[in-house]
């Protein structure tokens, strides 16, 4: 939720360490799913649509970063300017944003989260996966938790479990 202050805090304080220590090293795969809390964050859905419109031109993460950098002060009138700043084709971006065609994707993301018990932002799942589907167990973390106190220990624990699994004869590989 690009309008959520706790999501913004996670993005600014916790995400850089997770990215540096786990994602960039290939130890984990990070999947971002939209979960705009529209009943309290009225601008969050359109911001999510803007990120997906940028994704059509290969710039999801760059738009993601710009939107979170706004600290909740989202202005749909600025989205085309952000797109231009990223070097996107502005007409195509604006057409995408005005069409609402990304709405179905956002609805699927929300339904997916809701189906596994997500009801707040930010929320994270640390689990073993296969082809993007959650395969076994997992921990749901809700709220902007500190990296050192929460994520690092859970990610290390998950990494040890996966290493142990791959070393046994039970491995499907």
Per-region residue spans from a language model:
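Structural alpha/beta surface segment adjacent to cysteine/selenocysteine redox centers
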Residues: 2-84, 89, 156, 164-173
